[in-house]
Structures are given as C-alpha cells and as structure tokens.
Regions:
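Carbohydrate-active catalytic/glycan-binding domains of CAZyme proteins
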Residues: 4-10, 21-336
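Sec/Tat signal peptide C-region and signal peptidase I cleavage site
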Residues: 17-19
C-alpha cells in the first residue's frame, strides 16, 4: 500500500528475489491490471466481490462475478468518489469490502484536501443486500488510540469476537508503520486496548522504508495466520507472517510468533516483483484457498513508486505444508 509523508520518496536499493521452480498457473494472470491492494471476498450468495486501489487514488471501485476468473472481465462500478474539499479528499487507498450482519462496510484510508499525508482510516456503510445498490453512507473516521498516520484496516472474527488489524505510525517509534490489533465494539468503533503485533525489525522489512502494513487473516489447522507486507512499494515489497494458536488470547502479544524470513517475494523466473498487500479467498469448490495480491511485471521504477500505476491484481492457489502452515510458493508467471 502506498504511504504518505512519513514514508514518501523513491527507493534506490535493489532487492533480492526468490529462485524456485516456476509454479503451475491455474488462473489467468494478471486478473485485473492497474489495481493494487486487492481485496476479494466471497459472499454467502456465492458471488465474488473485488475492490482495490486505483492509480488515481480518487475513488472506490467494485466488481462482481460468479467465478474468480470472471472478475477479470466483470464491469467495474464506482461506488464512492473522494471529496473535493475537507476530509476524505486525497489518497484513497486499500479499500476492503466486508459483510457484517446484514450490512456492507468498506474500510479505506484517506486524507484531507489541505493535508494529503494526514492519512487515517474511514468507514462506509450500505444496508442494501446488493453493494452496487443502495446508499454508501459515510460513518466517519475509525478512531484508534493515537491520531497518527494509519491505514490498511482489516476486520475478522474469531471465537465470537470481532477484531480490527491495521497499520499505524506509533508516536516515538523508529519505524514508519507497525501492525496493531483491537477488538471492535461495532463496525466503526474499537473497544478496549490496542496491542502492537509487529514492527519492522528485520532487514527485509526495512528496505527503503521501515514498514509493516496490509494485514490479512486466514484461519486453518488450529492456527490464526496473519500475513502482512513490508518495505517500500517497489520491487522490495514482500510479505511476512504472524502465527497464533487458535485457542490463545489474540490480544496477548505473546500469543503471536513472527516468521524471521519473508514468506512471499519477487521472482526473476516468473518476472513478478514486489508482491504484496494480499487478501485471501476460496475457489469455487469452497475448499481450495486462493492468495490474492498485487505485483509489477518489472523491477525497475523511474521516480516515486506511488506514481507507477502498474501494480496488477493477481490470484493463485495457496498450498499448505504437512506441518499445517501456508506454502506461498512464488508469484506465478503472467498467462496473458
């Protein structure tokens, strides 16, 4: 996900990339060009919904299909457009669509017109059964413990509680953003303490910028897995992993173990660079897990990566190791 004044600027370091056998491609890739920070959800009606950041950072788009592959050619609708003045007027980033109860919500990041790096988390609500219809009501800023640079809100439930994971700059911290977690009292309200899950401590998390962002959760095999993205939004971008026992207290930082190495990085063999800001969904069979992410088809970028539009939405099967942990493999090659 792009970042603002705390992290603005171009990267000059050249990152390493993974070397592995080229995986079999089960899907058409890229799925959608020039759509970054992709979030795909499968609703109970069997339909898939895709939203993502657009290069202009000025609107929230949505498309739907009965199949994952169909999202690539589905008609795209603009469901919300930035304000021209005041709040929510700039840097519309990383929307996520969630159905909570009988209501749709979109979580996204935005900044005011007069301070475009004052990025915070905002919430939209739509009571219609169809998220393309009805009215998207602005429910305001989702307040965290600090009024600082914050983005990439991701909500999930576990053992009857709803949680929000997000990225934020911690006052006094020596990093751009870390990952935080809190329980939710309602779709746009946190309750109780917020805990720090991770800060950029390894070299691979600090290439260009010291960043942990873009959390996403998948629960399998008695564990809660939270992926996140690290480093600058160029070819250095990669994914890390946090793991908690499903029986543990997720609000205890000690419940979470952090993988010391990235779990998903760019690949010279397949020609994909800077993969990250992922989400998870399932295939049409209801069993096969699918990794959703963005990547660029080249490593070199002229100028600020924020201004390079070619982060494309991609999907591929997510495998599982015999020990019950996810096997991300490497980004699949383009098929088109």
């Amino acid at each position: 996900m792009p970042r603002g004044a705390l992290v603005a600027g171009a990267l000059t370091a050249v990152p390493g990339v993974a070397h592995a056998a080229t995986p079999h491609a089960a899907y058409r890739n890229p799925l959608v060009e020039r759509r970054a920070d992709p979030h795909i959800t499968r609703h109970t009606d069997g339909r898939y919904y895709l939203t993502a950041s657009v290069p202009e950072y000025d609107r929230i788009v949505l498309r739907s299909s009965r199949t994952l592959g169909g999202l690539g050619t589905a008609e795209e609708s603009v469901v919300w457009t930035r304000h021209t003045t005041g709040d929510m007027a700039a840097h519309i980033w990383a929307p996520e669509l969630h159905r909570i109860g009988t209501t749709w919500y979109i979580y996204f990041a935005a900044a005011p017109a007069d301070d475009i790096w004052k990025i915070r988390i905002w919430v939209l609500e739509n009571a219609s059964a169809n998220p393309f219809r009805g009215t998207w009501t602005e429910r305001g800023q989702l307040a965290t413990a600090w009024d600082t640079f914050s983005l990439d809100a991701h909500t999930f439930t576990h053992r009857g509680d709803r949680y929000l994971a997000w990225a934020q700059h911690e006052p006094g911290a020596g990093s751009n953003t870390g990952l935080f977690l809190s329980r939710m009292a309602g779709p746009w309200t946190l309750t109780g303490p917020q805990i720090r899950l991770s800060t950029p401590e390894y070299d691979w998390e600090r290439v260009g910028f010291a960043v942990n962002e873009g959390p996403a959760v998948i629960k399998r095999n008695g564990r809660v897995f939270m992926t996140y993205s690290a480093s600058a939004t160029d070819a250095s971008y990669c994914m890390g992993l946090l793991t908690a026992d499903a029986r543990s207290d997720l609000m205890d930082p000690a419940s979470w173990a952090k993988s010391p190495e990235p779990v998903f990085t760019g690949s010279e063999e397949t020609g994909q660079y800077g993969p990250g800001h992922n989400s998870f969904t399932v295939a049409e069979d209801g069993r096969t897990d699918v990794l959703v992410y963005h990547a660029r088809p080249y490593p070199e970028i002229t100028g600020d990566p924020l201004h390079d539009p070619n982060r494309h939405t991609r999907i591929q099967r997510l495998a599982w190791k015999t020990d019950g942990t996810p096997d991300f493999g490497i980004p699949v090659a383009d098929t088109v």
